[in-house]
Structures are given as structure tokens and as C-alpha cells.
Amino acid sequence: MFCLTLTLAAHGWGAGKLTAPELIALAKAHGPELRAGIEATFDAKDLKEGTAWAGQGPEFFFAVEAATAPTLVVDEQPGLPMEALPGSQLWFGIAYVMPVGRLHQFHYVVNGADFGGRLDMPAFGPLSYLQPGVPGGKLSEKLIHTSKIYDGMKSEYWIYVPAQYDPATPVAVMVFQDGGGYIDRTGNNPVLNAVDNLIAQKKIPVMICVFINPGDIADAPGTPTYKAVKGHADRWGRTLKDAMRSTLYDTVSDRYVRFLRDEVLAEVGAKYNLRKDGYSHAITGASSGGICSFNAAWQMPNEFSRVLSLIGSFTSIQWKEDPAVAEGGQDYPDKILREPKRNLRVWLQDGANDMENPRWGSWPLANIRMANALKTRDYDFHFSFGKGTHNGGQGAAEFPEEMVWLWRDYDAAKTAQEYVPDPTEKGKPFFRVSSLNRDEQ
């Protein structure tokens, strides 16, 4: 879609903001600094709308502005009374939310009516926090690549090298689309912590991670790529940068995976000893980055054989935008059914409250179609379908589990493996819409 937004009402980091443990400690002590801490940490809009929260592990802090006493409801469990802050209309509460590594929801009940809340509240597990004694890897400075395949497009990217990397031994590689959203250890998607922990526990192989942002074509006016992207932007009222991202990620062709293979990974491989086999290459992204990752592996399964697609945009965003490309993302379920089977391992994630777009289609139904097509053809796949929106929270909370599943049974002595369905998936039924969110007629 347009961009990946990981929406947390409070990050707890930055000037004046408090972490969830700090807020919880103040709340338990009934310290006089609590009100100032709440007002510094949360936006006034989130407090008024009942969408403010902060969490670490299973411990969560909630704050809301209300004229009368609100009750907090988490995952439809019995309500928790909130405590008033004297001299204000602010209320606060603490909740212990389980299980971790999962997405949760909350809302309030005020005067008998539901109010505020969010459907996307991830509870991160221990593996999303760097564990004691685990060595952290090194993130490069921001690098810039100028593309030939995309006529001078400039892309920002970062290289992450784990502490266990030995230049004498070639290592696996994983490429992250919208990469800048994954490089903050204390952010909404603490991938670096999980990678370090999982490598240390030998649950995934030693790997170099490449975090790449969508490119910018603004400095290459007059080129064929610029003209095509500018045309898409003008037709649909999108910015040039957003249209470039969609052109890269949503187009059903081999152009982007050639860009990764021939330019980006070639550049990274000149500095680090990367394995060349697709068995040792994984790719991931969210939203348009999700379909991008699947498309890259579909086009070149010998380059990428492991796919992690989060809230993937298997919809018609780039359909018929390029006259030379006949298909759109909405065609992938049928392509899976009708075309020769690829040797891929695929984790899909989406939420029941993902988008319904009048131009491009339904994200939840598209992902369900993808899952059923993969199951029909006996692909090695997993579909994690929750209740979330078009938001990265569920994928971020489940990331350690996703990685362990994606890299399970990896053997560095091999360069290939025929993927077969996970035994836990093999006997399960197809996905069905068994209930509707409306009264029966």
C-alpha cells in the first residue's frame, strides 16, 4: 500500500518520554511525577481518543482522558477499573497481558458505551529484547546505491553483521524491504535484538541482514523510469517517492529481484562473504513489501527460497500500470494454482481488520486466497491470521517465531532442500470465513 506504518501510541523513547517500566513504577508509587510523565509521553490526541498505551513484555500502562470513570477491557477479558489522577480528567491503569509474542486489543467502557482502544497492541516476548550475555552485532552507517536497472534511482540501505560473523566462512543473508523501519533496537520492530538472540541460541544460522529502503528517482528526470513513475504518481495523486515504492514493490515482474541480485547483493557481497545459494537467502517485507518479497522469490526461487510476507498487498495496485506487465498482485493465487510449483517456504501474516480498498481490493481475502492456493499445491507455508488492521504490530510481535519457522532444519552443509509442508499444517483444513461481523438477516 502507500507506506508501512507501525502505530504505537507511545514509544517511550525520546526527549521527555518515559518507558513503560518507568510509567508503571510511578503509577505503583503514586508519585507526583506521574501526571507530568503521562503528558510528556503521550500525545494529547491519543489521551482524548483513548488510544494511548505503552508496554514492555507482558506489562502495559494505559492512560485516558474521560469525564467519568472508564473501565479498561483487554482482549474481551473482564474490565479493569482505572484510577483517577487528582486534579485532572486523566485516568491510568496497569495490566499484565499474556501471552507475549502475540497481538492484543483493548478498549474502554465509559458510561456503558465502548470508547477508544486499538486492535494492534503487540506484546513482545523475551527474544525481542537483547538478552544478557548475548553479543550484539554491528549496523553499518547508511549507504547509498545508485541503480542502473532503475535508471539512476538512489536507494538507502544498511548492512547488519552479527558478532559471530567470520570472514572465512560464507553466511546466509536476509533482505528486509522498507529496511529503515527495522534498525532501531528500541523501536516498534526490534528485529536486531531477535536476530542476535536467535543466532546466539543457534535457532537460526549466522546471517547478514540487508535493510533497504525504497529508492528515490527524483534526481533522474527524463529517464524512462522517472517518466513511468511520474505518470503513476499523477494518475493516482501519489507522491513521486510513494509511486517509486509501488513501482518497485507491487509490480509483478523480475525487475526488482534482478536489482537485488545484480546490484545490491553484489555490492554487499564485495564486502562480506555471502552464501550464493537460494537455500541460504530469505526475504521479507510488509504491505507492498510483503508482495514484493513473495514476487522476488517467485520470479527467482534459486535466489530467494524463504519468504516472510506481513500484511502483504496481493492486490491490483500496479495492475496494467506498465503496458509490458500484464499481471497484477491480485493474480498471484491463480498463478500459484496454475503455474509450475516453485521450491519455496512461505510465512504469510494478515489480520481480519486489514484494508478494504475500493480501487485495489480486499487485503484479508487476498491473503486467505494466497494461503488456500499454497495449501492446495502442497507448499511449505504457514498463515498467521489475527484480528489486526493494516499495521505491523502482529508481524513484529511474532518475528522470533516467524524466523525460527522460516529457518527450521537449516543445514549449513547443504546448498539446497526440497521444501515439504510442515507436518503440523498438513492435516489442517482450508481457511474459511466462518462468521461475519454483522447480524444475521
Where are these regions (language model features)?
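Bacterial N-terminal signal peptides
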Residues: 1-9
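Boundary at the C-terminal end of the N-terminal hydrophobic targeting segment
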Residues: 10-14
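Non-catalytic cap/lid and distal C-terminal segments of serine-dependent acyl enzymes
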Residues: 15-79, 85-441
